[in-house]
């Protein structure tokens, strides 16, 4: 990664997103966090918070345009927002809609404006956070499992159909990670062999970026 890279992270208020932001601020990059709340108590001229809702295409489009206007480009975009609802086939329609909006449509909205930018720049890296549940399953959450499978399918299609483009795409599929989302779930089946620390996940992400791996398996 270049020393003056512009990095954007959605879902940056905690967990993996916050660890990504912290890591790249330490490297001196310009980092923009997109989320509903700002949890960073830092005074760093390279950090910028933009309030936005990843479920809204209008919000995403306006924020990315704002970033381009201010910074001139985007080098790395981490599409990282996520939620977790416990439930089976009886999960409410609103839970299903929320999970699909956050875990699938947010990436769709971002890709619509980001990919043309990357093609114009002739470079860029689109990193999408999915989950090991998207490769296997999450015993306690049907909505999470199904929509994370959709996340991976989306990333695969984008990668295959842009194979000869000048930008890269990766999908991140970690096992259980110690975040606010998994707090109190240390005894869940997914965490029986322990939870990963967010910083460890970022280590694996950096290795994969260097090697240009599509599937990142922390």
For each predicted feature, which ranges?
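Active-site-adjacent segment of SDR/Rossmann-fold oxidoreductases
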Residues: 136, 157-167
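C-terminal helical subdomain
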Residues: 171, 187-218
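Residue(s) in the substrate-gating loop at a strand-loop-helix junction
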Residues: 131
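Active-site helix of classical SDR
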Residues: 111, 147
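Conserved glycine-rich cofactor-binding loop
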Residues: 13-14
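The beta1-alpha1 cofactor-binding region of Rossmann-like NAD(H)/NADP(H)-dependent oxidoreductases
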Residues: 51-62, 93
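Conserved mid-core segment of classical short-chain dehydrogenase/reductases
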Residues: 83-97, 140-143
């Amino acid at each position: 990664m270049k020393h003056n890279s512009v990095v954007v992270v959605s879902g940056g208020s905690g967990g993996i997103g916050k660890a990504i932001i912290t890591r790249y601020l330490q490297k001196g990059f310009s980092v923009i966090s997109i989320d509903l709340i700002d949890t960073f108590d830092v005074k760093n001229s390279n950090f910028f918070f933009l309030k936005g809702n990843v479920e809204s295409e209008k919000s995403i489009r306006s924020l990315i345009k704002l970033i381009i206007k201010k910074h001139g480009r985007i080098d790395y975009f981490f599409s990282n927002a996520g939620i977790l609802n416990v439930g089976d086939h009886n999960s409410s329609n609103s839970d299903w809609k929320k999970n699909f909006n956050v875990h699938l449509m947010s990436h769709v909205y971002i890709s619509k404006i980001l990919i043309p930018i990357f093609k114009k720049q002739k470079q860029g890296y689109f990193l999408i956070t999915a989950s090991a549940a998207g490769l296997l399953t999450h015993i306690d959450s049907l909505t999470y499992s199904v929509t994370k499978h959709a996340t991976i399918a989306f990333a695969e299609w984008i990668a295959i159909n842009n194979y000869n483009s000048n930008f890269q795409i990766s999908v991140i599929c970690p096992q259980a990670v110690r975040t606010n989302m998994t707090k109190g779930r240390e005894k869940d089946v997914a965490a029986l062999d322990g939870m990963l620390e967010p910083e460890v996940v970022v280590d694996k992400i950096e290795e994969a970026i260097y090697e240009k791996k599509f599937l990142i398996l922390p």
